[in-house]
Curated annotation (Swiss-Prot):
The keyword Transcription applies. The gene is rpoB. It comes from Dechloromonas aromatica (strain RCB). Its EC number is 2.7.7.6. This is DNA-directed RNA polymerase subunit beta. GO terms for biological process: DNA-templated transcription.
């Protein structure tokens, strides 16, 4: 393999046994791709797919006026350029968005001739702002970065389930079916305990299902025909003959003797008919058999029976045959009677019974009944009934199964091969009767069908033909087009009568004991709605509001001569979008503690949110791990607490397909031969295959070598022959998420602890000097690069300039496009605040002259080290008890760790002050504050704003501000002072911004925002000038490189050419050489007149190109200057806003929470002097002492293995360091490295590195050789021992330690080694808090709670019991009164303390008064009797 520029600096030794067949896909692809599909901004309007914004527009437009005389059509949309880039939006508190404009066409028809277009107006209309996604998959909303979390919701389609016997006391299973559309009414079918089948619409009152079947146009006869097989009886005067279908008799008890044609008895009466009997009946070829009359009595008539002579209906379908009816039938000379075939076992008479319970008789009556159920209390007019019913499931506007819903529906009804299409026919409503007749004749349709169609026009033209294949529908469309009908073929996304019937059929089959119910937690029944889809739904909701308003205004459009922009008001759209991105449950404040937390947040999948589950309603099953999660959703990473199992993370190789189902990657296997073909399968498809695990044994040719292979099939684990295997996992770690795959030796950790480990890595605070983990899993580089924290080269080239804040790269010629500037400038992020107040700082990794390729890491970010994720520090750890300081997971730490700033982190606090325009006059930001002394103002400049670099602590003034005070009555002394000095100092009060308590640090940045029209102060101007200076530097660098390239090209072009003349009196015919060119400024080279016309032309082109580049740079600079100098958008009433950023250094201290990567968390209990720490034989002290009891019960043994391997890594590093100090040759170093890298696990080709690179790499390995033990494919025990032996360490990983205080050896050997240990974001500085007198709650008058409110500590019920138990009555009294809510008492205490008297007078607690009032509000008179 080839190593990148960064990898060469430090190769990570991997213990993986299997070569990677598929690289980990880009980790943010789900978010970016989803939003890209939503916008489609890079696609030409005519080539856009019908999804995202395009789908939203096409589903609402065209909007037709009520009269039908005017319509507004959608043509296309375009997105403008965003006004500010991402960083500008973050600084100014703006939303990173671009304006959406839609081109719409207003078509006005002629009133006299409705088919004639009178006029057409086309115009671009502003449709609001659409927030844009940053390159890292987040959004900047009002200056803060947010993430839209994907939602896992129930897929549209049809689902069959039962109540698990919970509804009825008998434990009977009640089956139900539910049709869930993407949008529209839910349709439920359910059995009741008496086996009658009902339906509900939107969980309203239930009605017999036959009412719905009649409403969709079926008669009773048709209903019975659909759901039952028929038995045929032949009637004659004296006997009844039964037409035998032998199979139907199985399991029945014979009610008479079955005698064959030869008189042999086949089944005696009262005997159960078995399979043998049925074979005998078949062999005897009995077609008809005479049966007693009581065999027919009680059966149900299948079809209406009509007396042919009189035309009278003798029996209706679904009537029960009684003796009277039988006599009537004979009387009417009916010879054949068909009855329903039912039995107790597997052919229930459910539909028949339901039909009997149904009171409606006709289609119209059924529709009226449904109308009454949907709109109780409204009078059912014929038109209203039709509109409501057709709107329920047939209207495209109101009902949409969506593509995925239709796919799931068809799959469940076993119609996989037929995609259903429907023919939308519009433009018939205006045709006269005669025209419709012609149309009917030409198309071969009944006139009634076409008239039906016309009556359905108002609710989205209905289909003429449904559930047909594409070719059938297209053939019909071709017939209708010439007849003036507006024909459109589209997939059937509404329900059809056939759909409803088939759903009921399957439900009846389930009740009959055939078929299986659906598992709603199966990932084939749950789909992901990503950003794009969620945004599209919101946009559509906004458009629907616009549509209503446009419909109203369209009628005025023709009379008032309005333009499209007069009709459309973009506010509802903007409001819907703003509400979604700003306050939706799925739009979350981005977790930016470290790169991993950022990337995990974007890969999160939540079952909560609008249209999803709620915490309270979600049961155990939804939260549990399901077999289909394999490779799709991580079984480990989920929060602890009420959200467990509802919020998940995508697995490493998971991706979301076009339908929204999560897929995972598999290798194809053909007859036991594993290929390198990769296929992505969703949970639906995977159910049909046999899948082997990634660790299945393969021979040298890549064939499965075991006789039986462990596989998964239909959610079960089985052993299968190699020939049966169809797919194989791509990687052992494909079942876990990013965070879980960063845990080395995960396979040795208990799942509960692995969950904590995965979650706690996301809380790790970036350290001042990030350090790569000695023991990693090999995925650290992927995470660092994909998270966007590390800066990655966009194009290859040579590094031209480097400083702490920027890297300039001259791009390779073959990677530049003509007319493009061949310069990449990477402005690094310096000391910037993240959402969690941690510090984001990028450090360049390249030097001037380095050659880099596309994708190489140019600069490290927060928590990355040489392009690898580095969340913590490698610490020398000993597992032993130490004087109780590691009791209950406490952590004992050496003072050296603190002294070396190993866990020191920088946190940046943003403090804001605003100057408003008040009723009494404007507030002013100034240095002139009378009440402050010079010492307090010493850090402020002339504008009253703190200097950058000032060291500040709690209480210091950062920004001076005064607010006008209302005029008050002056005392005589003040009047005298004012008379003498004539000043008005007393009418302002000091409202300066001060450093809050608990913060002490350095001011690192100040930003001043001024409203348009208000004069900027000096400081604001200076900040703008500084910005412009930086921008100018960038442009100058670009220009310098462009010029250098241009001059190099010119030099190559004109050297050796003859000249006709030029500067410095160049004679005609002189050959130009280098000496001549070096003697003048390169800008004068363009004045040389060349003899060769072609070369002269090329020279002119280069000159023009340079001039154009200068012009472009001037325009860019001017644009930037204009942007910076224009006024800032500030909230109403705000004149000026100042933001001050203070960097706070947080050193490790007792009370801080720390953790390893295996869920081994604890709190620092004591920081011990180095000399007292336990030390090894050579005198080196350990850094951290952990409790050995924290391992066995927690079952996270991975930490022990990590410690052993970490020790080997460090030992090998020391050996390499010793070789370098001894100045060993590159060959010797290469030999030792080869021994380390190629003795086991994945081999590395060190021959690719030259000697200089080998020595540079060895220099980087001095601190330890980094190892990778991939999840489920990591280092074995023997390999760890081999590495320990190579490093010259004891293979047990245990050593004798000595007590630092006494110098004596501890009794037994102790496990010592290096572990990657993290400092978490739960810092004692943020939690420590003490209250003096502070705010009180308005109602109860008790002190508020919490640090943010400067609150008190709650003295709860149990604490009161404790004091009662001790009999400390006075302490208890003051706790419940003067220290809490006795208002008069606490004032009195204050007075007493001031007077020097130390006594209390407890009175009535305010909360008692609140209780009294509460009881009185319940109309109970309660009063206090005072004695």
């Amino acid at each position: 393999m080839t190593y990148s520029f960064t990898e060469k600096k430090r190769i990570r030794k991997s213990f993986a046994k299997r070569a990677s067949v598929l690289d980990v896909p880009y980790l943010l692809a789900t978010q970016l791709q989803s939003f890209k599909d939503f916008l489609q901004d890079e696609v030409a309007p005519e080539k856009r797919k019908n999804e995202g914004l395009q789908a939203a527009f096409t589903s609402i437009f065209p909007i037709v006026s009520h009269s039908g005389n005017a319509r507004l059509e959608f043509v296309s949309y375009m997105l403008g350029e965003p006004a500010f880039d991402v960083t500008e939006c973050q600084q100014r508190g703006l939303t990173f968005a671009s304006s959406l404009r839609a081109r719409v066409r207003l078509v006005i028809m002629d009133r006299e001739a409705p088919d004639t277009v009178k006029e057409v107006k086309e115009q671009e209309v502003y449709m609001g702002e659409i927030p844009l996604m940053t390159t890292n998959g987040s959004f900047v909303i009002n200056g803060t970065e947010r993430v839209i979390v994907s939602q896992l919701h129930r897929s549209p389609g049809v689902f069959f389930e039962h109540d698990r016997g919970k509804t009825h006391s008998s434990g009977k299973l009640l089956f139900s079916a539910r049709v869930i559309p993407y949008r529209g009414s839910w349709l439920d079918f359910e059995f009741d305990p008496k086996d009658t089948l009902f339906f509900r619409v939107d969980r309203r009152r239930k009605m017999p299902v036959t009412t719905l079947l009649k409403a969709i146009g079926m008669s009773s006869e048709e209903i019975l025909d659909q759901f039952f097989d028929f038995d045929t009886f032949l009637l004659s005067k004296d006997k009844v003959e039964f037409t035998l279908v032998p199979e139907r008799l199985r399991g029945e008890v014979a009610r008479f003797d079955f005698v064959g044609p030869d008189g042999v008895l086949i089944v005696p009466k009262d005997k159960r008919i078995t399979a043998k009997h049925i074979r005998d009946i078949g062999a005897a070829a009995i077609k008809q058999i005479v049966v007693p009359e009581d065999f027919l009595i009680g059966r149900v008539v299948a079809k209406n029976i009509v007396d042919k002579a009189t035309g009278e209906v003798v029996a209706n379908a679904n009537d029960e045959i009684t003796e009277t009816l039988l006599a009537k039938l004979r009387e009417a000379e009916i010879t054949t009677v068909e009855t329903l075939y039912t039995n107790e076992l597997d052919r229930g008479a459910f539909i028949s019974n339901t039909l009997r319970a149904d009171e409606t008789a006709t289609r119209q009556a059924a529709r009226v009944a449904i109308y009454r159920m949907m709109r109780p209390g409204e009078p059912p007019t014929e038109e209203a009934v039709e509109i409501l019913f057709n709107g329920l499931f047939y209207s495209d506007e109101r009902y949409d199964l969506s593509g995925v819903g239709r796919m799931k529906f068809n799959r469940r009804l076993a119609r996989q091969d037929v995609i259903e299409y429907k023919l939308m026919v519009k433009g018939l409503a205006s045709k006269a009767e005669a025209a419709l007749k012609n149309l009917a004749e030409a198309s071969g349709f009944a006139l009634s069908a076409i008239q039906d169609l016309v009556s359905l026009m108002p609710f989205g033209a209905r289909a003429m033909v449904e559930n047909s294949t594409l070719s059938e529908v297209e053939a019909l469309a071709a017939k209708l087009k010439p007849l003036g009908a507006n024909v459109e073929v589209r997939e059937q996304l509404t329900l059809s009568p056939r759909d409803i019937v088939e759903v009921i059929k399957i439900l009846v089959e389930l009740r009959n004991g055939r078929g299986e119910i659906d598992d709603i937690d199966h990932l084939g029944n749950r789909r992901v709605r990503s950003v794009g889809e969620l945004a599209e739904n919101q946009f559509r909701a906004g458009l629907v509001r616009v549509e209503r308003a446009v419909k109203e205004r369209l009628s005025q459009a023709e009379s008032d001569n309005l333009m499209p922009h007069d009709l459309i008001n973009a506010k509802p759209i903007s409001a819907a979008i703003k509400e979604f991105f700003g306050s939706s449950q799925l739009s979350q404040f981005m977790d930016q503690t470290n790169p991993l937390s950022e990337i995990t947040h974007k890969r999160r999948v939540s079952a909560l949110g609008p249209g999803g589950l709620t915490r309270e309603r979600a049961g155990f099953e939804v939260r549990d791990v399901h077999p289909t999660h394999y490779g799709r959703v991580c079984p480990i990473e989920t929060p602890e607490g009420p959200n467990i199992g509802l919020i998940n993370s995508l697995a490493l190789f998971a991706q979301v397909n076009s339908y929204g189902f999560i897929e995972t990657a598999y290798r194809k296997v053909n007859n036991g031969q594993v290929t390198s073909d990769i296929e992505y399968l969703s949970a639906i498809e995977e159910g049909n295959y046999v899948v082997a695990q990634a660790n299945a044994s393969l021979d040298a040719n890549g064939r499965l070598s075991d006789d039986l292979v462990t596989c998964r099939e239909k959610g079960e684990t089985i052993l299968a022959e190699p020939g049966r295997v169809q797919y194989m996992d791509v990687a052992p770690g494909q079942i876990v998420s990013v965070a879980a795959s960063l845990i080395p030796f995960l396979e040795h950790d208990d799942a509960n602890r692995a969950l904590m480990g995965a979650n706690m890595q996301r809380q790790a605070v970036p350290c001042l000097r990030p350090e790569k983990p000695l023991v990693g899993t090999g995925i650290e580089r992927t995470v660092a690069v994909d998270s966007g924290t590390a800066v990655v080269a966009l194009r290859g080239g040579m590094v031209d300039y480097v400083d702490a804040a920027r890297v300039v790269v001259r791009v390779n010629d073959d990677e530049t496009i003509a007319g493009e500037v061949g310069v990449d400038i990477y402005n690094l992020v310096k000391y910037t605040r993240s959402n969690q107040n941690t510090n984001i700082n990028q450090r360049p990794m390249v030097r001037v002259g380095d050659h880099i390729a596309k994708g190489d890491v140019v600069a490290d970010g927060a928590s990355t080290d040489k392009g690898e994720l580095a969340l913590g520090q490698n610490m020398l750890i000993a597992f032993m008890p130490w004087n109780g300081y590691n009791f209950e997971d406490s952590i004992l730490i050496s003072e050296r760790v603190v002294a070396e700033d190993r866990y020191t982190s920088i946190h940046i606090e943003e403090l804001t002050v605003v100057a408003r325009d008040t009723k009494l006059g404007p507030e002013e930001i100034t240095r002139d504050i009378a009440s402050l002394g010079e010492a307090q103002l010493s850090r402020l400049d002339d504008s009253g704003i703190v200097y950058i670099g000032a060291e500040v602590e709690a209480g210091d003034v950062l920004v001076g501000k005064v607010t006008p005070k209302g005029e008050t009555q002056l005392t005589p002394e003040e009047k005298l002072l004012r008379a003498i000095f004539g000043e008005k100092a007393s009418d302002v009060k000091d409202t300066s911004l001060r450093v809050p308590s608990g913060i002490a640090g350095t001011v690192i940045d100040v930003q001043v925002f001024t409203r348009e029209g208000i004069e900027r102060d000096k400081r604001a101007q200076a900040i703008i000038d500084e910005h412009l200076r930086h921008y100018k530097l960038d442009l100058a660098d670009q220009m310098r490189i462009v010029e250098r390239d241009a001059f190099a090209r010119v030099e190559r072009l004109i050297t050796g050419k003859k000249a006709n003349g030029g500067p410095k009196k160049l004679a005609k015919g002189t050959v130009i050489d280098k000496v001549y060119l070096d003697s003048m400024d390169p800008h004068h080279w363009f004045d040389i007149r060349l003899a060769d016309d072609e070369a002269a032309q090329q020279l002119e082109q280069v000159k023009d190109g340079l001039e154009q580049a200068r012009k472009d740079f001037d325009i860019a600079f001017e644009g930037k200057r204009k942007k910076l100098t224009q006024g800032d958008e500030l909230p109403p009433g705000v004149q000026k806003m100042v933001k001050v950023y203070v960097a706070v250094k947080r050193r490790l201290q007792p009370g801080d929470k720390m953790a390893g990567r295996h869920g081994n968390k604890g709190v620092v209990s004591r920081i011990l002097p180095v000399e007292d720490m336990p030390h090894m034989e050579d005198g080196s002290p350990v850094d951290i002492v952990l409790n050995p009891l924290g391992v066995p019960s927690r079952m996270n043994v991975g930490q022990i293995l990590e410690v052993h391997l970490g020790l080997a890594a460090k030992g090998l590093g020391h050996k390499i360091g010793a070789m370098l100090r001894a100045q060993s040759s590159a060959k010797e170093v290469r030999g030792f490295l080869d021994q380390i890298y190629n003795s086991s696990g994945k081999s590395e080709n060190l021959d690719e590195l030259n000697d200089v690179e080998v020595l540079e790499m060895a220099e980087n390995l001095k601190g330890g050789v980094p190892f990778a033990t991939p999840v489920f494919d990591g280092a074995k025990e023997e390999e760890i021992k081999a590495m320990l032996a190579m490093a010259g360490m004891p293979s047990s990983g245990q050593m004798t330690l000595f007590d630092g205080r006494t110098g004596e050896a501890f009794e037994r050997k102790v496990t010592v080694g290096y572990m990657h240990y993290l400092k978490l974001h739960h810092l004692v500085d943020d939690k420590m808090h003490a209250r003096s007198t502070g705010p009180y709650s308005l109602v109860t008058q008790q002190p508020l709670g919490g640090k943010a409110q400067f609150g008190g500590q709650r003295f709860g019920e149990m604490e009161v019991w404790a004091l009662e138990a001790y009999g400390a009555s006075y302490v208890l009294q003051e706790m419940l009164t003067v220290k809490s809510d006795d208002v008069n008492g606490r004032t009195k205490v204050y007075e007493n303390i001031v007077k020097g008297e130390h006594r209390i007078e407890a009175g009535m607690p305010e909360s008692f008064n609140v209780l009294v009032k509460e009881i009185r509000s319940l109309a109970i008179d309660i009063d206090l009797e005072r004695y």
